[in-house]
Every structure is written in structure tokens, then in C-alpha cells.
Amino acid sequence: MQLNSTEIAELIKNRIEQFNVVSEARNEGTIVSVTDGIIRINGLADVMQGEMIELPGSRFAIALNLDRDSVGAVVMGPYADLAEGQKVKGTGRILEVPVGRGLLGRVVNTLGEPIDGKGPIENDGFSPVEVIAPGVIDRKSVDEPVQTGIKSIDAMIPIGRGQRELIIGDRQIGKSAIALDAIINQKNTGIKSIYVAIGQKASTVANVVRSLEEHGALSNTIVVVASASEAAALQYLAPYAGCSMGEYFRDRGEDALIVYDDLSKQAVAYRQISLLLRRPPGREAYPGDVFYLHSRLLERAARVNEAYVEKFTNGEVKGKTGSLTALPIIETQAGDVSAFVPTNVISITDGQIFLQSDLFNSGIRPAVNAGISVSRVGGAAQTKIIKKLGGGIRLALAQYAELAAFAQFASDLDDATRAQLEHGQRVTELMKQKQYSPLSIAETAVSLFAAEKGFLNDVAINKVVDFEEALHAYMSNEQAALMATINEKGDYNKDIEASLKTALENFKSTQTW
């Protein structure tokens, strides 16, 4: 069959009409240098601060320096095979991480990818790692407690839901142990937990995960890991990623607790990135915005009011407040709390738990220094019975610390001073607590009642710990109803005082101490 010229022209015209040109505009640039995880890119226009840049091999970098002719970006992951001249693409997206209940019980990296070998994670969507903190109008005052199960903290340095309480001290002194005990104590309280491990050894993180699993708290916890072997960018971003995962619960009218272990290592990672980006160094070679690094993170831990939750959930959740409580950890060098990063974080947070190495070495664990530890907002949230009975504990310890120094020089002490010294020694012994053995409100109250009402006065100092263990066992067996009432209501009145007094008198009559 032969076609004439008219038919050929018609066919060509039809083909041209049907031809669909898909134009794709790409924002592309070229790598001009690669230095220790920092890449400099030319030709990349219209890039946002913090934008994800797609690299060869399904990797991403984050734009941090936006200069007139080039972009400085930090690579999130391995960078050894990146080379000058390779093409990169702008994505127009800010870094997001998966959020939702599916993350509970899982161990993930900074990007929210599972690293525990338990398969993919079902998420409820994605959330940007950098989010503006709730405003003043959206917040509610802190008035509900977070029970850590550690009697020295619950009695003297109470923590409320939505508070930021710093844990500060030298290395290997029990900072992480306090945070872990607090997480383990939340397994039946409805508070979800997030543990962010920054710059730690993989073996240390494995031990943490194992401990949480053994004590039944892993199913209620998200573990975010940026280990010491990972890129500085991932260590810098890990706390923000963990915070976004915690905000998922806060914004839906639930309560969450997040532990940053530790922010000193995050500051070091950020210092490394900043120096490689040639930003001007300041005090201790940290960049000028290292305060903002931590303030914008810790301000996201807050108690939000009912209106905020209702607006966020489009009316699905009504009459509920949400909270995100933060326990940031800072490591000091030889007890120097006046260094740059420690002073910054102390000024940002609502109080600090200061751990001292000489207390730790003398067997007082947790090694909390009651004199300079403080909770600025937690007092309003403290359980009534703990508040009433714990008031004299801090005073007894303060007086003991003052008198102990004086007693070293004076041999003949009057009876009142000697009684005060011995009471202080017994209270110090009473504040000791083993790791992974959090106490209920009632158990803490019973211990404080024994100290406050003089039931320890005739107990030998080296028997105080045994006395307390036996007392708790007796109360849970013989006074189960009273303990349940205290745990449920947390009230303190004359009836409860009389019941506790009778119970302790009966207990002390069973054996001599």
C-alpha cells in the first residue's frame, strides 16, 4: 500500500499533536570539594537553609552554609566515595523523620530507619526535625509529677510533666543510670519514653537496650542512636529527630519523657561541623550559636494546654493537655560546671541534678549533691505526701554537711549536735538506692516517714539499708491496702499519718535493729 504526500503530511501532523513533552526542571549543582564530611557545591540555586541535597548513591547532605557562589553542606553518612565534579540535586525538602506509635519498642538511627533487625516500621507519617517550639499562649504551667522512682530525686528535686531537668556530672558517675531508672519507672504510668544516645559506644547502647528489655520498659520506649562511629551530622541531628518523635505524643494530648544522653557530645559534633564549614570559633572553639543549638531543642519540651491539643488534632482530642519532659545530660570535666556548654544548659533548663564524684566514690549512690541540685518548677507538681514528708530531708542533709566538717575539729560535741549528726548520717544512708529498683510513691513515703518521725534514731547506721528493705517487704505484705491507697491518691492526712505510725511501731516490735 502506497501513501501519497497528503496522507503522509496528515500522519505527521497527528503524531506531532499527540507528542507530549514532559519538561522537568532540576536544581542541579556540582561538588567542588569534599573535606571530612563537608562538601562545597557550585551552581546550586534556590537552596533553603537546612534543605536536603540528593547525592549519588541514595544519600543526602544538609545545606548549612549558603554563600553567594557556593553551598556548604554536611553529608549524612559515608562520604569516602564522593568526588569533585559529581552532580547533586536540590530536593526542596527539609529533613523529616517518621513518627508514630509504631516506633515504640524499636531502635532507630537519626533518620528513623530501624537498626534492630526487627523489620520495617509502620509510621503515622513524617515530621520535620526542626520545629518551632510552642508559644507562651499555648503552654500550661507544670502541675503533674513525673515519678522517677528514685527517692532522693522525688523527695528533694521533684520533676514535673513538661519540665526540663538537667543531669550533670563527671563521666562514669551514674548520670545515665538515673535517666534509665526514670524511663523504667514509666512503664505503667502511660508516659512514653524516648532515649537518644549521642556519640556513645555501640556496646554501651546495646547494654541500655538490653536493660530496658529485661525490665519490661522497651515496649514503651523509642531508642534513637547516633553512635560514636557515625558521621558528626547524624550526632548533631539525633536530639532533634528524637524530639520530633516525642512531640507526636505531646501534640495529641499524651505525655512523653525524652532523655538526651548526652548533649556535650552533640555540642562537640556541632563544633566539628562548624569549624569545617569555616565558621568563626568562639569560647572553647565552639561557634557563636552553640547556645541556640541547645535552647531551640530544649524549648520544645513543654506542657501544652487543651486548646493547643484540640487545634492540632482538628477537634479529635478535647480537654486533654500534652507534655514532653526532657532530661538532658551534660558531662563535666573534673566537676567544672562553669565551662561554656554546662553554664549554657543550666541557664536554659528548669533545674539541675548535680552528681558528685566524691559522693559516688564514697558509696553514696545515686551521688546526688542535694545542696546545689534544684528543681525550679517541680515543687508545684510534687505528690502531696512526698512534699509533706520530704521537706525535712534536704534540711537534715544540709545541716549534716555543715556539722560534719565542724565535727572533724571538735571532739566534745553536745547531745543536740551529736543527735543532728547521727540523724544526718542515717538520712544519707536512707537516700542510697540500687540501680533498676525504682520505688513506688508509697514505698518512698514510708521511707521518708520513718526518717521524719524518728523511727531510724535507734537503728544502727550500717543497718539502715537493711531496715528499709525489711520495712518495704513488711508494708507490702501486711499493709497492702494502706500502700494501695497512698499510691492511688498520694494524699497525706491525719488518718494516713496515724496508720503509718501504727504500722511502723508494729514493724519495729517484730525485731530489734
From Swiss-Prot:
- Show the GO MF annotations: ADP binding; ATP binding; proton-transporting ATP synthase activity, rotational mechanism
Looking at the UniProt record, the site noted as Required for activity sits at 373
Q: Which InterPro entries match?
A: ATP_synth_asu-like_sf, ATP_synth_asu_C, ATP_synth_asu_C_sf, ATP_synth_F1_a_nt-bd_dom, ATP_synth_F1_asu, ATPase_a/bsu_AS, ATPase_F1/V1/A1_a/bsu_N, ATPase_F1/V1/A1_a/bsu_N_sf
Q: What does this protein do?
A: Produces ATP from ADP in the presence of a proton gradient across the membrane. The alpha chain is a regulatory subunit.
Q: State how it assembles.
A: F-type ATPases have 2 components, CF(1) - the catalytic core - and CF(0) - the membrane proton channel. CF(1) has five subunits: alpha(3), beta(3), gamma(1), delta(1), epsilon(1). CF(0) has three main subunits: a(1), b(2) and c(9-12). The alpha and beta chains form an alternating ring which encloses part of the gamma chain. CF(1) is attached to CF(0) by a central stalk formed by the gamma and epsilon chains, while a peripheral stalk is formed by the delta and b chains.
Kindly provide the name given to this protein in its UniProt entry.
ATP synthase subunit alpha
Broad class of the protein's primary localization: membrane
Q: Which keywords label this protein? A: ATP synthesis, ATP-binding, Cell inner membrane, Cell membrane, CF(1), Hydrogen ion transport, Ion transport, Membrane, Nucleotide-binding, Translocase, Transport
Q: Where in the cell is it found?
A: Cell inner membrane
Q: Which GO terms describe its cellular component?
A: plasma membrane; proton-transporting ATP synthase complex
E.C. number(s) listed in UniProt: 7.1.2.2
A Pfam family this protein belongs to? ATP-synt_ab_N
Superkingdom: Bacteria
**Annotated catalysed reactions:** ATP + H2O + 4 H(+)(in) = ADP + phosphate + 5 H(+)(out)
Annotated membrane topology is: Peripheral membrane protein
This protein's gene is called atpA
